[in-house]
Amino acid sequence: EALSYAACTADETDECLQMDEKCQVHDSLFWDRWHKLNYRSVRKTFEYMKTAPVTEVWIDQSLEKAWNTTWIPDSLRSFRPVFQQLYARMPAEWQETEKGKLIESYAFPAPTVEEGDDMADGLLYDAEGESHHLSELQGRYILLDFWSIYCGPCRMSEPEMEEIVHLYGDKLALVGISNDEKISWSKFLKEHKMPGYQWKEPKNGGRSLASRYKAGGIPHFVLISPEGKILKMWTGYRKGILKSKLKKFISEDTIQ
């Protein structure tokens, strides 16, 4: 039954994507509908997992659904106590595995941040393997872009990101944070010139920057002030939205 709900989510998502422009990926109508379907799928899956045998399949399902308890809307965060109970069912030796530790990070995640809060920071690395932190960019506005190679709207935003990098110069640091596998991400960066800094974070589950900034959908953008305060967070892309958002926070007299 849980799997049928998951299939329903996938089928209706495809249907939604084929609808008119009012229900495109970057639109709130799409995400509202997707979240409702996903909620039903997660609820059914977790109910089954309460009594199902703890096997490799059970572990993999835990990881697949875990991120839903972390950064998607408040209704899904209500599942976190249930997920903590599921984690407690895991044998101790499984909790010590790489997957077990990742599941534990989702069961007991780091707190998320909101607009007005100090920025969250963490370990990032570039394509050469060099370590970085967002703090090294303080003193400038920082625009975080959580994205993926396979995300259509993410790729659509690239020309406008090129524009804002040129427009704001050293007043703004654009930081792309990919959720792709390291090999495919590195290969892509070698073949495509991407704007700004292109970094990636180690797999850290519920304690990742993606989790802390609630990047449940992509592209997900976060604008940070030179003082390290979160000014604005939003999900989705449509032409002109980046310039429109930045213009509200960065005065024109700062532009080169």
Q: What are the residue ranges of the model-derived segments?
A:
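Oxidative protein folding and maturation machinery
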Residues: 1-132
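A structural signal for short secondary-structure junctions
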Residues: 116, 137-138, 168-169, 191-192, ...
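Short, internal strand/loop/helix patches
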Residues: 123-125, 175, 189-227
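Conserved redox-active cysteine motifs that mediate thiol-disulfide chemistry
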Residues: 138-139, 146-163
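Alpha/beta-hydrolase fold active-site loops
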Residues: 140-142, 219
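Hydrophobic, well-ordered secondary-structure elements that form the walls
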Residues: 144, 185, 198
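Structural microenvironment flanking redox-active thiols in thiol-disulfide oxidoreductases
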Residues: 155-192, 204-211, 244
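Non-catalytic, surface beta->alpha helical segment in thiol-disulfide oxidoreductase systems
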Residues: 217-218, 229-254
